Amino acid sequence: MNAESHFKGWAKPGIIPPGLAAEIAVEPHETLDAISGHFRLFQLRDGHRFSTDDILTAWYGTSWCPSAHTALDLGSGIGTVGMICAWRLPGAKFVTVEAQAESVALAKKSARYNGIESRYEIREGDFRAPEILRADEKFDLITGSPPYFPQGAGIESGHPQKLACRFELRGNIADYCATAAKHLAPGGFFACVFPYEAAQLARVEAGARKAGLVIVRKRPVVFREGDSPLVGLFGMMRADDLPEWFRGQTWTEPDLIIRTREGRIHPEYSAVKLAIGFPP
């Protein structure tokens, strides 16, 4: 048992990537952080850091679309959602789209470190722009962790990465739904995360409806047992891919609880983390 194969008694699953042997340097303003199994992620030391919301989006999408051969991650940032999905779907080919050059550069370093460059394409640009995604490009699984708030709805960070991850600078939940609907393969699945408060939930539902999507399942996420859900995970499919009788229903799953009342990690969330190659 050593630090390369284990972490606090937990055996790291999955393939061992080339890592730093691929001649990649960790710059002073960067960190290199463990994600799934032996995969790692380059992040800015003082920039946007991956979150529980990102982790859950990847888990939800790959759990309910486990046989995907092609996948698209919208607004992919530094690559958290896409990298975890790629770890869980080792045979799938990925396209990710991100508008910020600095985040794209970090994601490319991570893809190289993790040895997935041949099946993981990172495109720089606004996913709403017609030149970014061809009309004929279709994907079995599409994921998105969109910004939650319109500009002016809260205190805005001065850091470009943090600002774009929180506020709707380039599209909102409706744009994510519209793009997903255009690029889902027949029977494809779109997974995203968004606030669960009533007004925000209404935005998800309106965006899905306008795009011709059906929210086939959703799961509220409670960060502390006993509290109200702060975010929800949503799984959508195109209405045209479903029988008419099914299009008007959504299965609401039990709350996913992150921490118990005492502050310990909830047993189910520990199991979720194990499923995506994280220590419990």
Spans of features found by a protein language model:
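Mobile active-site "lid"/loop adjacent to the S-adenosyl-L-methionine
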Residues: 146-176
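Conserved SAM/SAH cofactor-binding pocket of Class I
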Residues: 59-144, 150-155
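General small-molecule cofactor/ligand-binding pocket signal
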Residues: 42, 95, 121-123, 216-219
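SAM/dcSAM-binding transferase cores
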Residues: 228-280
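Residue-level signal for inorganic ion chemistry
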Residues: 57, 145, 176, 236
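N-terminal auxiliary segments of SAM/dcSAM-dependent transferases
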Residues: 1-29
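Conserved Class I SAM-dependent methyltransferase catalytic core
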Residues: 169-225, 229
